């Protein structure tokens, strides 16, 4: 079981993001209407990103910037 570190929601509560760490990498669960759309690890081009990066990604998901 993975412990969720932080949860964010869109204003209309249709989009939700859950931030958690697994194997020393932050991940963001991207959810619409209770359905998991994607679990995105916060790694790009071999770079493991910070919690702050994961929070930005979660916020972008909730705002609809990431689709």
Residue ranges and their predicted role:
Residues 1-9, 32-67:
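Mixed-charge, Lys/Arg-enriched low-complexity segments
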């Amino acid at each position: 079981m993975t412990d969720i570190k932080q949860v964010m929601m869109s204003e209309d509560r249709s989009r939700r993001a859950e931030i958690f760490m697994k194997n020393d990498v932050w991940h963001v669960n991207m959810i619409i209407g209770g359905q998991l759309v994607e679990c995105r690890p916060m790694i790009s081009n071999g770079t493991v990103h910070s919690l702050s990066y994961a929070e930005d990604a979660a916020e972008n998901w909730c705002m609809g910037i990431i689709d």
